[in-house]
């Protein structure tokens, strides 16, 4: 008979609010169930997609007899780091040309944020980070556990289902000088609401005037508009003024490498000399955390980014994914219009990227799960990438019923 465990007093932890949606979905035997919780792209048939260019890159790596499985340096694959910085900042970026960027390979977006957060907690004079309200559910946990104090700034206006720009400016305007500010580079998660370029410029001016430190999270480059350059405009605006910033990048969404955990943290510094020292300190954060990053996913990304034909093939496939999501938005909007669902649903086609913040409340979300077997997070966020022409009528029926029966 097993003896009593020293961990017997542990409480059962709750499911993750996002990943827990899939756990519940998997337990549901219904043939009409739809999972709109997790941000992973699905084909029109509802299947996970591996990009053709990714399969080709993997095959090339497998067929290369000189390829080995040795440890990478603490900072990761050098080619991957250079190409990642170039992708987000632009090939002609002055920061890159002047060697002012320290880039390290990390474990996708989450790992990049955590390494950046721990670096700031150790080496930056201000320990407070302002994050948008709402934001991705993991952001506050990542930064709190990294040793930072988390505050929020207004971002989303439920009344307009758009940006609360005035509230954003007021909150950042009253933040202490030098505070860190988390910014979603594009396709804000969970709202799908982004500032215009004019608004970005006002945000930049305000932040630089108060010496607020930008920390960008770029999880969807190319996925919002279908253009890699267009989706990086906000970031490049901040780099162009010569100021410093942090940038967390992920290839989970735009290359479909969810399970490979491929990402990068770049810190744009004031000089090349500072960048060298920053990199040396990033190594001291990474080494006791996970020693060094995995080789396979980064090799796939580097193979694609350094070959012009493969890069072009990737941009075509990426635009195809972005365009399908835009089409899903239009189809859902049209379906609700046809049903004469109460309310204004134009925000569905105005918002961009993988997610739509529907405006549905938690009771309506629970009703749709119970009655229609539709799974989403309790805040009403749906992953447009999980929809198809086949499932849209079912979702529209569910939304119509929820809005009609529950206020």
UniProtKB/Swiss-Prot annotation:
Coiled coil: none annotated. L-aspartate binds at residues 39, 136, 189, 381. It catalyses: L-aspartate + 2-oxoglutarate = oxaloacetate + L-glutamate. One of its GO terms (biological process) is aspartate metabolic process. Keywords: Aminotransferase, Cytoplasm, Pyridoxal phosphate, Transferase. Pfam families: Aminotran_1_2. GO terms for cellular component: cytoplasm; mitochondrion. Its cofactor is pyridoxal 5'-phosphate. Its EC number is 2.6.1.1. Belongs to the class-I pyridoxal-phosphate-dependent aminotransferase family. Homodimer. In eukaryotes there are cytoplasmic, mitochondrial and chloroplastic isozymes. This is Aspartate aminotransferase, cytoplasmic. It comes from Oryza sativa subsp. japonica (Rice).
């Amino acid at each position: 008979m097993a003896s009593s465990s020293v961990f017997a007093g542990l409480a059962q932890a709750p499911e993750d609010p996002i990943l827990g949606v899939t756990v519940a979905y998997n337990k549901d035997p219904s043939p009409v169930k739809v999972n709109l919780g997790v941000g992973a792209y699905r084909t029109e048939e509802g299947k996970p997609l591996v990009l053709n260019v990714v399969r080709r890159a993997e095959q090339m790596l497998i067929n290369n007899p000189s390829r080995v499985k040795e440890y990478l340096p603490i900072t990761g694959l050098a080619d991957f780091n250079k190409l990642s910085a170039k992708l987000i900042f632009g090939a002609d970026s002055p920061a890159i040309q002047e060697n002012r960027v320290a880039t390290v390979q990390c474990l996708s977006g989450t790992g990049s944020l955590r390494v950046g957060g721990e670096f700031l907690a150790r080496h930056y004079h201000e320990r407070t980070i302002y994050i948008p309200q709402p934001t991705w559910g993991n952001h506050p946990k990542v930064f709190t556990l990294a040793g930072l104090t988390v505050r929020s700034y207004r971002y989303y206006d439920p009344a307009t289902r758009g940006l609360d720009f005035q509230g954003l400016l007021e909150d950042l305007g009253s933040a202490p000088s030098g505070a860190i500010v988390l910014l979603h580079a594009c396709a804000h998660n969970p709202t799908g609401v982004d500032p215009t370029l004019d608004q970005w410029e006002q945000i930049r001016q305000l932040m630089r005037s108060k010496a607020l430190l930008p920390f960008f999270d770029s999880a969807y480059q190319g996925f919002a508009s279908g253009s890699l350059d267009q989706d990086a405009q906000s970031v490049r605006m901040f780099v162009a003024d010569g100021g410093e910033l942090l940038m967390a990048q992920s290839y989970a969404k735009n290359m479909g490498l969810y399970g490979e955990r491929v990402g990068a943290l770049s810190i744009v510094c004031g000089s090349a000399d500072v960048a060298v020292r920053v990199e040396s300190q990033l190594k001291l954060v990474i080494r006791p955390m996970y020693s060094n990053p995995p080789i396979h996913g980064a090799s796939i990304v580097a193979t694609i980014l350094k070959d012009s034909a493969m890069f072009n093939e990737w941009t075509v496939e990426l635009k195809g994914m972005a365009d399908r999501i835009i089409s899903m938005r239009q189809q859902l909007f049209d379906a609700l219009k046809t049903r004469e669902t109460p309310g204004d649903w134009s925000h569905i086609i105005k918002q961009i990227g993988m997610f739509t913040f529907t405006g549905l409340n938690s009771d309506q979300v629970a009703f749709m799960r119970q009655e229609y077997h539709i799974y989403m997070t309790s805040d009403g966020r749906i992953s447009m990438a999980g929809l198809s022409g086949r499932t849209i009528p079912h979702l529209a029926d569910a939304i119509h019923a929820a809005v009609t029966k529950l206020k």
